[in-house]
Amino acid sequence: MATQIDASSEAAAATAAAQHTPMMQQYLRIKSEHPDTLVFYRMGDFYELFFEDAEKAARLLDLTLTQRGASAGTPIKMAGVPHHAVEQYLAKLVKFGESAAICEQIGDPATSKGPVERKVVRVVTPGTLTDAALLSDKSDVFLLALCVGHNKRGVASNIGLAWLNLASGALRLAELAPDQLGAALERIRPAEILAADGTIESVPAGMGAITRVPAWHFDIASGTQRLCDQLEVASLDGFGAQALTSANGAAGALLIYAAATQGQQLRHVRSLKVENESEYIGLDPSTRRNLELTETLRGTESPTLYSLLDTCCTAMGSRLLRHWLHHPPRASVAAQARHQAIGALLDAPPNAGLDSLRSALRQIADVERITGRLALLSARPRDLSSLRDTFAALPALRERVAEIASNAAALGRLEAALEPPPGCLDLLTRAIAAEPAAMVRDGGVIARGYDAELDELRDISENCGQFLIDLETRERARTGISNLRVEYNKVHGFYIEVTRGQTDKVPDDYRRRQTLKNAERYITPELKTFEDKALSAQERALARERALYDGVLQALLPHIEGCQRVASGLAELDLLAAFAERARTLDWVAPEFTDEIGIEIDQGRHPVVEAQVEQFIANDCALNPERKLLLITGPNMGGKSTFMRQTALIALMAYVGSYVPAKAARFGPIDRIFTRIGAADDLAGGRSTFMVEMTEAAAILNDATPHSLVLMDEIGRGTSTFDGLALAWAIARHLLSHNRCYTLFATHYFELTQLPAEFPQAANVHLSAVEHGHGIVFLHAVEEGPANQSYGLQVAQLAGVPAPVIRAARKHLAHLEQQSAAQATPQLDLFAAPPVVDEPECNEPPAATPHPALERLLELDPDDLKPRDALDLLYELHTLARSGPADAQR
């Protein structure tokens, strides 16, 4: 019965297909193989999209949607793009998270019976971009696969991640706990995530385009074997990946998908890096966001720490900087080696110094991405010429590095890495023209002298004019026809033209080709032979050039690993040189490291803020076992958050390997950096501002260790005063007594300034400010001891709050101060007045009420006064001021 049903279904499908034209049958077959992908179907000079694909592309790419004819009774909707401009349209699609299958004509239209043979040669997806037109120069694009591991009870026990930068061939693996997935994805920022049904729900929203792949692709045993095959090894022990489980399963799925999209092997994926959580300083999503490492809180790329540090001369260096900022090593050994290299670059003699080195680096091409395209056989002519010119410049660059490498082991290692693969430069120099065309199809790519056949074909095509001149001269002499001409047109090709009055002199070997009113056109055997050669020479030259170019790409494949080594060395050298330039230009110093717990920063500065203002006030920060928590008070806008962030940024920069903005800095071990600064509603997640705040605080309290640096800014402000105060007090105590981490704790709760009395490891500091008239001047200096008020009204006035509101607030504040003094209630926060202090006894009786002049001033509204009324009021106030409160009462 089942067989009959299958046969019926096949017959129905065959009947339906027969109703379509042969070309549409071909298209529909290809589309059925890529149902979730937009198929770009090559037709002559255009890529066409049909039916639903056409409608979608027209909407996303702003294309004209047309309708031409019908197939099987269905109108054919079409939209198309020129083949030479397809990359810009693909770039737009990728930004929308869409994928495209590029279907090319692979058959010869002249010999095809029916539709020209076509097939999909590559699939462009958000995570598999390699073409320069689709990539940002300074950002990597990652394809990530996610595999959930389960224990014997079927509960998720770990998550394996494998992510690939297809443009460079860098492959990384990691295994982590399920609750760490969000932080890992925030750090990696994949453009595309591969997941099987049942695990897609594990992916937080907004983390990249999600692609469903079959569950069997994630088989762990198959994935392990596929990794071994890809890396051409018998075991993964040398990469530290043999003990991995779910990560190897993820790697297997990733390699299957990536190879399928490219339609070929991934020849440049030849190494593997296993990332362990303990290897890097932990930075959770909140910390990355609040420290504005690579993106501001407003979502812009500048001003950030990345934008400040990125003076790299190559795109490779800029991309490496982004990676280093998000992966600061915990071990100080790597940072110290980088500091040593920076010092050597700064101390180098002028002829081999920093400026000379950076000038040479500016001539370097993006070797990393060119190598990726080489491995995928998609490198274009100018990629190869750029690679050739870069390799030609490497000997001089190596000499500069060698002159200063004796003072830094890291530079010596990089100098060795900059040696081009043997034979690679020679091949590129011989094969590629000095200034090749952009595309092989345009010709002029292969250098003269590389291939004799190509040179001959070019000579025929290029020397055509001279041959015709020589032939015309010879024929005039042979025939005695002085006005004989040898010419060419597209309709009749080459011909010899003779006027009617001279036709009696035409030799017997002339064959008539065309008769005109006043002339006859002929062709000779010699001219016919030349015509056959000339007309086909250019076409044959282009075909020969294409074949030779493909041969060059194949010949370069054995050099892929050597090119990758050079690219890695260039990127690191460029980044270290950029760090040195920043240190010299911005007056930064080399930090020191110690095994003792502590952070000491002398005259530290916020690197990004300092670059935005004319003058920046430097401040010290000292944290050690006797001083673990700083309670930071002071006015709003006084600089508390800036001081906290600059401490974290200076620590991060030190471990990344950069010099730091300070007079001196010394750091003990740091394992994680936490921030709880600012908050906003998570509407999508159904969480209020206070809930977000408490969630971040909980993560800190649960995970911070004695080696962690914690920034807490105004915790507890999202609820009632007493609740917030109680929470802030308890959190600060817990950080001191249990976590014992380095903590900067900013607050407006005055009661917390009493904490050092209970915990000697806590200390009070404040950001100073002075009142000037009714305004305030922020000094931005960190001083010992607590602040006594927050200057909230003055800050509101600076912010542009209307004057009537400020006056009303000032009046109500005076009322609250009187009420507070009368009831002797404790101060709840720094917006209130300072606590009442017992004054020594004096002979004068205390004032029972506020001064009458002040009361009169608070009653009036200056905006309602006429000039005459204002003058009268001035005399009245003068009189009240001369008399005391007692006189006024009398």
From Swiss-Prot:
SMART domains: MUTSac, MUTSd. GO terms for cellular component: cytosol. Coiled coil: none annotated. One of its GO terms (biological process) is mismatch repair. ATP binds at G634, P635, N636, M637, G638, G639, K640, S641. The keyword DNA-binding applies. InterPro entries: DNA_mismatch_repair_MutS, DNA_mismatch_repair_MutS-lik_N, DNA_mismatch_repair_MutS/MSH, DNA_mismatch_repair_MutS_C, DNA_mismatch_repair_MutS_clamp, DNA_mismatch_repair_MutS_core, DNA_mismatch_repair_MutS_N, DNA_mismatch_repair_MutS_sf. The keyword Ribosomal protein does not apply. One of its GO terms (molecular function) is ATP binding. Keywords: ATP-binding, DNA damage, DNA repair, DNA-binding, Nucleotide-binding. Belongs to the DNA mismatch repair MutS family. This protein is involved in the repair of mismatches in DNA. It is possible that it carries out the mismatch recognition step. This protein has a weak ATPase activity. This is DNA mismatch repair protein MutS. It comes from Burkholderia pseudomallei (strain K96243). The lineage of its organism: Bacteria, Pseudomonadati, Pseudomonadota, Betaproteobacteria, Burkholderiales.
